[in-house]
């Protein structure tokens, strides 16, 4: 049985979050939490929080054993992009794209 946790609209790009997601996909949750704790990337902190939420959901709602859990699926999709303007010289303006992503983590027993 799979248990899910989702974070929608995280303020980081999906491309950067996928680099971190690939590190923990398929690993036992204890090992995945260790990998995320020592990763210097901003996305690691966000993914770790979602993974901890999925673990808590599995334990509280379904009574699963934490030691038997593994990250079965981790999916990072693009979210809404906020468009901002950066003024430049001679009356011009550049667009700044502030990207967001949706992170879905599913944990299952081995």
UniProtKB/Swiss-Prot annotation:
Annotated GO biological processes are: translation
* InterPro entries found in the cross-reference section: Ribosomal_uL22, Ribosomal_uL22_bac/chlpt-type, Ribosomal_uL22_bac/org-type, Ribosomal_uL22_CS, Ribosomal_uL22_sf
Q: Which UniProt keywords apply?
A: Ribonucleoprotein, Ribosomal protein, RNA-binding, rRNA-binding
Q: Which GO terms describe its cellular component?
A: cytosolic large ribosomal subunit
Keyword Cell inner membrane tagged? no
Q: Does the keyword Zinc-finger apply?
A: no
- GO-annotated molecular function: rRNA binding; structural constituent of ribosome
User: Pfam families annotated for this entry?
Assistant: Ribosomal_L22
Q: What interactions and quaternary structure are annotated? A: Part of the 50S ribosomal subunit.
NCBIfam families per record: rplV_bact
Family the UniProt entry places it in: Belongs to the universal ribosomal protein uL22 family.
Chain's role: This protein binds specifically to 23S rRNA; its binding is stimulated by other ribosomal proteins, e.g. L4, L17, and L20. It is important during the early stages of 50S assembly. It makes multiple contacts with different domains of the 23S rRNA in the assembled 50S subunit and ribosome.
| Protein name in UniProt | Large ribosomal subunit protein uL22
């Amino acid at each position: 049985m799979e248990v899910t946790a989702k974070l929608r609209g995280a303020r980081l790009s999906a491309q950067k979050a996928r680099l971190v997601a690939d590190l923990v996909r398929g690993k036992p949750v204890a090992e995945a939490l260790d990998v995320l704790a020592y990763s210097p990337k901003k996305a690691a902190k966000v993914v770790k929080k979602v993974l901890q939420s999925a673990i808590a959901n599995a334990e509280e709602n379904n009574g699963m054993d934490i030691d038997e859990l593994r990250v079965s699926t981790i999916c990072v999709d693009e979210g809404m992009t906020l468009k901002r303007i950066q003024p430049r010289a001679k009356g011009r303006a550049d667009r700044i794209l502030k990207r967001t992503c949706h992170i879905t983590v599913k944990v299952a027993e081995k």
